[in-house]
Amino acid sequence: MERTLTILKPDCVRKQLIGAVTDKIERAGFRIVAMKKTRLTKETAGAFYAVHKERPFYGELVEFMSSGPCVPMILEKENAVADFRTLIGATDPAEAAEGTVRKLYADSKGENIVHGSDSAENAAIEGAFFFAAEEVVRVD
């Protein structure tokens, strides 16, 4: 069973879409094994997205991710990383496939509702960033 990390971003929380997006995730066969609502500081958001530090959008991303509450979750499913990235769609909602989370709910490339890990290795690192091992609970 593979795991991936998602973050329902501040725009998702602000638009009161936590339930709608979580429902779509569960209906796609993902099991939520860790979940919490939190608010990232600029420092925490900067640390999480440090891999993008040299990219032109880094400052805007850090500002946005620290602008309000977010909901990180660890999801479990066979082929979780690839299947989740298919479920959420392209980063730019204008390019996202019909029926994907971003096509349905995102307003722009910068405010695109949801983060999804890009590899199993990064999913493990990102999951540990938000959750201690004892916070990850599998229910059979």
UniProtKB/Swiss-Prot annotation:
GO BP of this protein: CTP biosynthetic process; GTP biosynthetic process; UTP biosynthetic process
Residue numbers annotated as active site: 115
Protein keywords: ATP-binding, Cytoplasm, Kinase, Magnesium, Metal-binding, Nucleotide metabolism, Nucleotide-binding, Phosphoprotein, Transferase
EC number in record: 2.7.4.6
InterPro entries named among the record's database cross-references: NDK-like_dom, NDK-like_dom_sf, Nucleoside_diP_kinase
One Gene Ontology cellular component annotation held by this UniProt entry: cytoplasm
Cofactor(s) needed by this chain: Mg(2+)
GO MF, one example: ATP binding
Subcellular location: Cytoplasm
Chief place of localization: cytoplasm
Enzyme class: transferase
Catalysis: reaction(s): a 2'-deoxyribonucleoside 5'-diphosphate + ATP = a 2'-deoxyribonucleoside 5'-triphosphate + ADP; a ribonucleoside 5'-diphosphate + ATP = a ribonucleoside 5'-triphosphate + ADP
CDD domains: NDPk_I
Binding site for ATP: 9, 57, 85, 91, 102, 112
A Pfam family per the record: NDK
Entry similarity comment: Belongs to the NDK family.
Subunit organization: Homotetramer.
Role description: Major role in the synthesis of nucleoside triphosphates other than ATP. The ATP gamma phosphate is transferred to the NDP beta phosphate via a ping-pong mechanism, using a phosphorylated active-site intermediate.
Protein name per its UniProtKB record: Nucleoside diphosphate kinase
Organism: Chlorobaculum parvum (strain DSM 263 / NCIMB 8327)
Taxonomic classification: Bacteria, Pseudomonadati, Chlorobiota, Chlorobiia, Chlorobiales
Gene coding for it: ndk
